[in-house]
Amino acid sequence: MRSALPLVLFSLVALCGRGDCRVANAEEKLMDDLLNKTRYNNLIRPATSSSQLISIQLQLSLAQLISVNEREQIMTTNIWLKQEWTDYRLAWNSSRYEGVNILRIPANRVWLPDIVLYNNADGSYEVSLYTNVVVRSNGSVMWLPPAICKSACKIEVKHFPFDQQNCTLKFRSWTYDHTEIDMVLKMPTASMDDFTPSGEWDIVALPGRRTVNPQDPSYVDVTYDFIIKRKPLFYTINLIIPCVLITSLAILVFYLPSDCGEKMTLCISVLLALTVFLLLISKIVPPTSLNVPLIGKYLMFTMVLVTFSIVTSVCVLNVHHRSPSTHTMAPWVKRCFLHKLPTFLFIKRPRQQPSRAPQSSLARLTKSEATTTTTLAMGPTSSSNLYGNSMYFVNPGLAAPKSPVASDSAGIPRDFRLRSSGRFRQDVQEALEGVSFIAQHMKSDDLDQSVIEDWKYVAMVVDRLFLWVFVVVCVLGTVGLFLPPLFQTHTPSEEP
């Protein structure tokens, strides 16, 4: 055992003789020399005089855009805030310490400018991890702490879901003002070298700006504008396209026949479906009264159109079920809706086929009835006009005056034939009056049915007119609502 002890000591001496051990000893000695309590106090600002400004260079690196909560108006990001300044007390001559030029020191042992996120939304102002600071031999200090920031973000819902937001991250020292430190931008924009793309937002620009207040010389801050644009595919698939399809169902209302009885049911069903979508939107966007979201405007627009279709359906049904006993068709209605509008609306009314005797037959029947009535009124001598050449009970010889007791060649008394012909004339007259009544009644029914068909045709023309109005207004309204947000431009806010 004693013989092995010299060998161990020799090995330790050999290892310490290597460069690594010398460097380790040099860094340890340098750490002790720099952070000696009699020489360095991490609570004191590294300034040679009380009037000297310590310049703090800031550079933001965006690692990930975690989320944007529209309802709570909070943006969550994963950032690295690079801070650089010069501390003359941490400078050394590298030749005296084995050529050591860089030294890593725990952040709690050196002075920090206590720069925090001013527009913090969760009350946690500390960084996620207090990493070491990197100190160089010339006294320059670099600190790159990672942080999960939850910042307040004013959400503009005007163009939702085709919106573009400008969320800001404002950094400022918590205890030092502009008379003690000066915050400057190392680069005009934030870095995205290590950025992980987001599935919901596109990064448009990340400009930074230094803000001072001329009226307050002690104020200075550095603000980064996160100009982000939403990827609308999710909301297009789940909100906009279903709304458009449901709205297009309202067009079918104008194609449903009025006798179907389902026009009002379809209209109200579409209206209820749009109301459900409106309730879904209210749970996504913030409850603000400053602006109405674009999708909300579209839903309200479609709800107005569907309500209009309900009103028009009521009017069309009212016109469709009119009859001559309740309404009289005005001449301007006939002229406008039966002759002029159908041509412009590409409607051609089919030619109506008469289902009963034509008007000329009815006229001949009426004329024959009048002739028969006159003949019967004139007596038996004119009955030949009714029966043509038939001489059943009247012959030409009866025209001459004879004795009332005379008999014909058959031996039948002539007064008996006259009495028989009088009873026959009465029966025929009653039969003809019945036929005339039936003919007039059928004619009246045909006229009433023709008027009813005219009212139904007017209802169809009105329905087609409202259909074209609905389609034109729906298309123009949809294009007018969704087209402007696609070409919107956004400029960073210049407010301090």
UniProtKB/Swiss-Prot annotation:
Component of neuronal acetylcholine receptors (nAChRs) that function as pentameric, ligand-gated cation channels with high calcium permeability among other activities. nAChRs are excitatory neurotrasnmitter receptors formed by a collection of nAChR subunits known to mediate synaptic transmission in the nervous system and the neuromuscular junction. Each nAchR subunit confers differential attributes to channel properties, including activation, deactivation and desensitization kinetics, pH sensitivity, cation permeability, and binding to allosteric modulators. This is Neuronal acetylcholine receptor subunit beta-4. GO terms for biological process: acetylcholine receptor signaling pathway; chemical synaptic transmission; membrane depolarization; monoatomic ion transmembrane transport. Neuronal AChR is composed of two different types of subunits: alpha and beta. CHRNB4/Beta-4 subunit can be combined to CHRNA2/alpha-2, CHRNA3/alpha-3 or CHRNA4/alpha-4, CHRNA5/alpha-5 and CHRNB3/beta-3 to give rise to functional receptors. Forms stoichiometries such as (CHRNA3)2:(CHRNB4)3 or (CHRNA3:CHRNB4)2:CHRNB3. Interacts with RIC3; which is required for proper folding and assembly. Interacts with LYPD6. GO terms for cellular component: acetylcholine-gated channel complex; neuron projection; plasma membrane; postsynaptic membrane; synapse. It comes from Bos taurus (Bovine). Residues 20-236, 287-298, 486-496 are extracellular. It catalyses: Ca(2+)(in) = Ca(2+)(out); K(+)(in) = K(+)(out); Na(+)(in) = Na(+)(out). GO terms for molecular function: acetylcholine receptor activity; acetylcholine-gated monoatomic cation-selective channel activity. It holds the Pfam family Neur_chan_memb. Its main location: membrane. Keywords: Cell membrane, Disulfide bond, Glycoprotein, Ion channel, Ion transport, Ligand-gated ion channel, Membrane, Metal-binding, Receptor, Signal, Sodium, Synapse, Transmembrane, Transmembrane helix, Transport. Residues 258-265, 320-464 are cytoplasmic. The chain crosses the membrane at residues 237-257, 266-286, 299-319, 465-485. Residues 1-19 form the signal peptide. Na(+) binds at E262.
